[in-house]
Every structure is written in structure tokens, then in C-alpha cells.
């Protein structure tokens, strides 16, 4: 029987025991474009363009400029791997997530020593430097800078205290500065930052990197499935049958995922916006899941970093767009959301949902119906039209 997956390390151990699902290399790689380029050819079957191909996840043990650190990429870039990691038949992943949303297990705060705080670097240290502490790759030569693509951003609403976890676009801008992009009107932490700004306050935030895949998948839910006040860490708790463990941050009034590989602590600064490519001046941000390189934003918020903590010999986890990893993270929660909405409207009719790779997990869904009456045909067409318009 396979060992239980509780964090990134146990997830990688499971993949190691699955033939053809993980490649590890000790060859030195540059984090600037080379690491992602090697993965594209070896792990992504030669391309990350649509239609994407599946290949093994990779671990790079020798990243130039970052002794003792490793980088994992492509962990979720296969529905087969996601199914194994979540102990579910790949075709039933959407249904499993749907039931997890409806049966949440909220996270709990632990008082035990947190693995993510085995090594502590504070911004007040004279040699503190994000560029050196965090082996964040620059995926293409025109990227705005080194990106943290799988950071679990965790913050709490200034008024209600309700917490939320979300993945955001994070770019290293300086020794103790990150830019964060909030899609206008579409993200809970963005709304929290706006409210904190109205109050003239900084918003404490933690960014946990290298976590249980259940957390990464669960964090990709969006409203209305998970409205404001719903902590998506509770989805991961339901998927695992036990609560996600949080620890208190050391330098800000927020919590972080206790068994993460890295945690970046900081505060979102009010009334400050930065140009995303202020250091590279390329005009671009990074490759996005639909298949294009997005333009750099001039409306990114600024995070002032106060600390970086990590495990001993930490593993940085990253992804590159557009890839099957995005299809898994965006698509499977979307399947769950569609399944839930249609099930409420047409109980027992919808058999399954699949968000296919050509749509990047968001723009194409295949719905399997069980038609019991002639009128079901019209209902089916209605849902198809509604989804096409949206």
C-alpha cells in the first residue's frame, strides 16, 4: 500500500514509485530560462503549447546560485498523477472535489514546531536577499523576472477575519519586495487588500510554497462555488479526511501552511502600485495558461517581505504555462463547479464533466448526460449555450 500523501515530499515519493512519472537530475541548470526549457523538452513532451503533451515530473537537484535547494516542476501535469495523489480514479476527480466543497474540514492551528520554520531568514538580517533565498525560475527570456508560480497566498479580511488561500502571480522585484497581481474584481485576497487600503492598513500575508497537492488543487476554486468567507484550505482538508495544519508566522499577524517547503511572510502595502517589468523592461509578464505571454501590468500591488522560512534542504515547486499542470489546477475545480450547478438544476442527469486540454481547463467542457425524457435534450442545449456564452 502506498504511503499517505501529506506534503510535497510524500507526494514526490509516491511519484518516484510510479514508473515513468518522475525524473531527477543532478546536472546544473540556470534558473533563467534553462530550467523551464529542459522541462519543456523532457517533462512536457517537447512543448507546452496547445495541444500540450504529458510527460514526467522533474526534480532539479543542482540549481545554479542556490546550493542546497532543489526545484520540482510538473508534479500536477498529468491527470493520472493527480488521481494517484488524491487517491481517486482520474475520471472521477471533478466529482470528488464537488463533494469535498460540500463537506469541508477547516484548517487548524498547531502549536507544534512547524517544519516550514526549520530555517529562518528575517528581512532585518544584513544579507537578506529574495533573489538568493528563493530559487524562483525565470521561465522565458522575456519574463518580467523570477516568478513564484505556485505560491499559496493566505490572508484574512480586515473586518471579518475570514481567511482565504489563492494562487497569484508573484514576481521578485527586489531584495525584500514582491509584486502581486490581482485580477480586478475576481479574487478574494484582492478584495481584502482593497479594504485594508481603505482603512489605511497593510494586509499581512503569507506565501506557502511546496505543499500537499490537495491544497494546490483546492486553492483554485472560485466564486460562486467558494464565496467570500469560504477558506479553500477546507477543501484540501475534506480531500484528505483531516484538517490542514497551520502555524503562526514569525513576523506578521497571519498563519502559514505548517509543512510547506518555503514560507514568505510579508505585508501588502496600501497606495503603492508598481510596474511588473520595472527591472527587465520587456513589456511582458509571463506565459499564461491560454497559451500566450501576458503583458506586464502597471497596476501590481507591492508586498514588503519581512521573512523567508523554509525546511532544511528545501524544494521549490514551480510550473510553467501553458501546460497540463494548468489544465489540472484550473480544470478539475471547474469540473466540480459545473457538476454542482448542473446537478442542482437537473438532479441525476449529469454523469460527468471533463475540462479538456485545448481549453486550458477553463474554456472548454465536455458534459456527459443521461437523458431520461425528451425534454432533457432542451435542458442539455440550454446548459451548453449558457456555458458557451459565459
Model regions and ranges:
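Extended, highly charged
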Residues: 1-302, 306-390
Amino acid at each position: 500500500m502506498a504511503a499517505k500523501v501529506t506534503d510535497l515530499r510524500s507526494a514526490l515519493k509516491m511519484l518516484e514509485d510510479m514508473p515513468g512519472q518522475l525524473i531527477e537530475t543532478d546536472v546544473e541548470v540556470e534558473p533563467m530560462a534553462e530550467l523551464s526549457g529542459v522541462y519543456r523538452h523532457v517533462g512536457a513532451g517537447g512543448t507546452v503549447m496547445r495541444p500540450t503533451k504529458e510527460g514526467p515530473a522533474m526534480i532539479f537537484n543542482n540549481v545554479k546560485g542556490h546550493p542546497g535547494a532543489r526545484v520540482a516542476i510538473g508534479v500536477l501535469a498529468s491527470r493520472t498523477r493527480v488521481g494517484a495523489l488524491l487517491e481517486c480514479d482520474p475520471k472521477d476527480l471533478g466529482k470528488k472535489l464537488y463533494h469535498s466543497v460540500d463537506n469541508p474540514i477547516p484548517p487548524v492551528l498547531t502549536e507544534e514546531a512547524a517544519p516550514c520554520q526549520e530555517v529562518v531568514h528575517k528581512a532585518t538580517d544584513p544579507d537578506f536577499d529574495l533573489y538568493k533565498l528563493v530559487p524562483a525560475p525565470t521561465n522565458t527570456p522575456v519574463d518580467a523576472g523570477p516568478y513564484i508560480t505556485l505560491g499559496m497566498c493566505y490572508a484574512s479580511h480586515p473586518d471579518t477575519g475570514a481567511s482565504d488561500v489563492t494562487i497569484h502571480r508573484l514576481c521578485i522585484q527586489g531584495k525584500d519586495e514582491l509584486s502581486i497581481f490581482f485580477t480586478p474584481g475576481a479574487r478574494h485576497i484582492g478584495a481584502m487588500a482593497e479594504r485594508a487600503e481603505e482603512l489605511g492598513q497593510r494586509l499581512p500575508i503569507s506565501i506557502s510554497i511546496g505543499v500537499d497537492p490537495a491544497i494546490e488543487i483546492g486553492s483554485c476554486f472560485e466564486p460562486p462555488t467558494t464565496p467570500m468567507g469560504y477558506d479553500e484550505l477546507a477543501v484540501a482538508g475534506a480531500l484528505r479526511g483531516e484538517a490542514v495544519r497551520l502555524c503562526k508566522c514569525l513576523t506578521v499577524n497571519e498563519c502559514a501552511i505548517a509543512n510547506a517547503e518555503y514560507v514568505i511572510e510579508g505585508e501588502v502595502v496600501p497606495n503603492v502600485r508598481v510596474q511588473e517589468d520595472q527591472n527587465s523592461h520587456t513589456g511582458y509578464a509571463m506565459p499564461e495558461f491560454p497559451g500566450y505571454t501576458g503583458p506586464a501590468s502597471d497596476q501590481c500591488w507591492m508586498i514588503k517581505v519581512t521573512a523567508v522560512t523554509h525546511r532544511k534542504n528545501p524544494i521549490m515547486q514551480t510550473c510553467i504555462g501553458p501546460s497540463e499542470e494548468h489544465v489540472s489546477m484550473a480544470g478539475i475545480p471547474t469540473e466540480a463547479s459545473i457538476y454542482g450547478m448542473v446537478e442542482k438544476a437537473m438532479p441525476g442527469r449529469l454523469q460527468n464533466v471533463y475540462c479538456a486540454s485545448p481549453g486550458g481547463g477553463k474554456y472548454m467542457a465536455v458534459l456527459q448526460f443521461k437523458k431520461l425524457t425528451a425534454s432533457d435534450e432542451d435542458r442539455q442545449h440550454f446548459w451548453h449555450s449558457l456555458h458557451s456564452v459565459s
